[in-house]
């Protein structure tokens, strides 16, 4: 049984963890909404079908599995436009700044970069760049869900409707 001091300490730790999760969800939400702004341009440039919109709309849904190669191509195009990647992989500095621009503090921004870097290293070395990026994105999504940083489907839908 916990004494009063232990109980207070436990409550403080739980509260601080909760407060860390909510702002992180906001960061991921804001990053995602900004990330997809160039989607129409990428679809036009790469002649991608409108069917990939569903993958972007439902990306953070835990039950949605992204398998469409075209979605990987769009993610690569968007990442390039935002200068988050180079020919050799993730641009750590630009990605760190991108996260900070969307509300992340230094710690959260670095954790996002670390997750992306870890996922980049973890995916198989596929010859098809679009499929490799798709696997990278799926890994990142899974890691964000483990941290409970994924924005809810309801919040994302409301934000997307508000932008229309």
From Swiss-Prot:
Q: Where is it made, tissue-wise?
A: Antenna.
In its UniProt record, a GO molecular function of this protein is: pheromone binding
Record keywords, A-Z:
Disulfide bond, Pheromone response, Pheromone-binding, Signal, Transport
Q: List the disulfide bonds.
A: 42-77, 73-130, 119-139
Q: Which GO terms describe its biological process?
A: response to pheromone
Signal peptide start and end residues: 1-23
Supply the Pfam families for this chain.
Answer: PBP_GOBP
Which Gene3D superfamilies does its entry note? Pheromone/general odorant binding protein domain
Quaternary structure, per UniProt, is:
Monomer and disulfide-linked dimers.
Q: What does this protein do?
A: This major soluble protein in olfactory sensilla of male moths serves to solubilize the extremely hydrophobic pheromone molecules such as bombykol and to transport pheromone through the aqueous lymph to receptors located on olfactory cilia.
Q: Which family does it belong to?
A: Belongs to the PBP/GOBP family.
Record-given protein name = Pheromone-binding protein 1
The species this protein belongs to is Epiphyas postvittana
Report the gene name. PBP
